[in-house]
Amino acid sequence: MPAYNAAKTLEKTYADIPFDIVDEVILVDDASTDETLQVANGLKIGHIIKHDNNMGYGGNQKTCYTLALQLQADIVVMLHPDYQYNPKLISSMAGLIANDVYKVVIGSRILGKGAMGNGMPVYKYFFNRCLTLFQNILLRQKLSEYHTG
């Protein structure tokens, strides 16, 4: 979980992870200024890394993936601790990979309850939709969202 100032939503997200199929949880705190690290420690998350300096979303993801590779993970799920993605869907999504249906499965904040209903700011939603429309036209695809982070 790439975390930045996620203290308010981390516990709810973590509680809904399906631990019957999830072996390890990695949380990388990207120099949060709130209580994210304390909440993570209280939850006894297996692997917690703290960045001393904010590395940004990309840097945070790289740290998550590097540790997942070191742990020799079979399937890696990048779950954001802000609950814009429902952790209860991990079993279904990972099953598609484990059963060789797909090599990659990408979640969408746009489908279902909707991104703004899950806390996405209006300006981010607007630009996400514009970029997705442009990319769908350019690439002749029909994805609900290209920018899932």
Residue ranges of each PLM-predicted region?
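Short beta-strand-to-loop acidic/aromatic patch adjacent to the donor-nucleotide binding site
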Residues: 73-84
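A short, conserved beta-strand element in the Rossmann-like catalytic core
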Residues: 31, 56, 84
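Donor nucleotide-sugar binding loop of glycosyltransferases
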Residues: 6-9, 32, 86
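Short, structured coil segments at secondary-structure junctions
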Residues: 21, 43-45
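A conserved acidic beta->alpha catalytic loop
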Residues: 29-37
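Acceptor/aglycone-binding surface of glycosyltransferases and processive sugar-polymer synthases
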Residues: 51-53, 57-70, 87-149
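Short, well-formed alpha-helical segments that are part of the catalytic scaffolds
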Residues: 4-19
